[in-house]
Amino acid sequence: VVKRLILFCLLFLSGCSKAILQDFSGEIYGTTYSIKIAENSSYANLESKIQNELKRVDYVFSTYKPSSEISLINNDNDLEWSNEFRNLYETSMEISALSGGAFLPKDNNGYDFSAIGKGYAIDKIAELVEQNGVKNYFIEIGGEIRSKGSKFKENWIFGIERPINSKKSPYIAFNVPKDGISIATSGEYREPNHIWGKGPRDLLSVTVAHESATYADAWATALYVLGKDQGLMTAESNGLKVFFILANGDSIQSSNWSMISP
């Protein structure tokens, strides 16, 4: 499942021209990350802490690192799980149960938290920056986000990309609530029939807004797997905030999505 989310932020208000947006960015998990802090004080000391936390989480769920916890467990069923690993597994199984098995943390190759790991890492970075006194931030890893507060009194904004053959605007923009939200998108815009092998599907992408990036990440995958009808039904029964882009470029949303203002 390819995750695509076009992200962008508003320009500064003219009255805040002296304020500096701090941006700590780099590469992790085979993708990029960016942590933006909109405070008048400098938080340069956070950069190394952020990098260390991202690397620490990588050594929990990365299936590409032979020495990661998940790799060691997949090679030794008797290995004791850490509390962190167990929590990821239990959250995965919770989403699996609520989605009728559409989200699975294990396949024939063993445990795999790829569809929940980036969201979990975002939540851990949010905990870190808040513990260090940051109240206004925008965290993005591989197109998934979590934000809180504002960008110098302006809302943070995120955009959902439309398919490349759409005749409508290339993205749909939404304000992020100032009390905080996490956003994750799952989908495939260019070759959905290649991925699924069953001709064109009715659904191109699913975007989930949730208080937790971990849950947003997992739910976006599960609902995309379910497809439009079952996905919308599952979203409604679980009170989720979900925005669907259909194969024809149109969109539908769950009733709770209205809480996310355009």
Locate the predicted segments by residue.
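Sec-dependent signal peptide recognition
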Residues: 2-8
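Mature catalytic core of soluble alpha/beta enzymes
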Residues: 8, 15-262
